[in-house]
Amino acid sequence: MLLFQATSLLALLCFTVRAFPFMEEEGSASFAQNVLHSRSFPVSHHGAFMDLPLFRQNRRKISQNFILHSDPREHMDEEALRRKLVWESAIRRDKMRSQPDQVLPIGQDALKRSRCHALPFIQNVFRKNCFPVRLPNKFCFGQCNSFYVPGWPAGLSQPCTSCAPSRSRRISLPLRCRSGHLAWQEVELVEECECETRYDRNTVEPAGSGEDYLPVS
């Protein structure tokens, strides 16, 4: 009886060694090294491991919930990105001073155009204790070339150009207030914009001109 049990145990041991040949000393060390260094399993074991029901279910959830998000600023050139950052900084500063919030939309195509021009937006016209009114309007946006000329006459201040309305009109807009009466608010409607050269607060000249002084070209 003891001899039969020993023979059965020896046969079982031989079968185990044949069934798992990769558990030899060299193969076992290689397998452990792969695990410690976070390498992938061999193809045969990796496929069987990932085909288990638990991993199939989790893999399906990951594939459904995983969405790639790309930053739109990655597709903008350096100059357009710089203008967008300056514009966003100006909007944040103005947002702290004005109420209700005023949104000035500006797209990538407008950022790539450097010259001053008019862009459409919806203006919030408001007054204290009155209901605001949303009015289609335009705002001026773009770059203007400023310059400094040595020898400029002492009586004239140095010019500075800015993007400003070149054609606009003013209207009176009625606002309905909480007390029941109407309040009239004057609003400027901008139609076109261009670069203007400013010498002081009260003097505005077309861009590139100077009174009694012509730079040598």
Curated annotation (Swiss-Prot):
The keyword Membrane does not apply. Residues 116-196 form the CTCK domain. It is found in: Secreted. InterPro entries: Cerberus, Cys_knot_C, Cystine-knot_cytokine, DAN. Residues 1-19 form the signal peptide. One of its GO terms (biological process) is signal transduction involved in regulation of gene expression. GO terms for molecular function: morphogen activity. Disulfide bonds join 116-163, 130-177, 140-193, 144-195. GO terms for cellular component: extracellular space. SMART domains: CT. Gene3D superfamilies: Cystine-knot cytokines (2.10.90.10). Interacts with nr1-A. Belongs to the DAN family. Plays an important role in regulating the left-right axis by blocking a tgfb1 cascade in the right posterior paraxial mesoderm. Functions as an inhibitor of bmp, tgfb1, nodal, activin and wnt signaling in the ectoderm. May inhibit mesodermal signals, probably through an inhibition of nodal/activin pathways. Seems to regulate cell fate specification and competence before the onset of neural induction. This is DAN domain family member 5. It comes from Xenopus laevis (African clawed frog). The lineage of its organism: Eukaryota, Metazoa, Chordata, Craniata, Vertebrata.
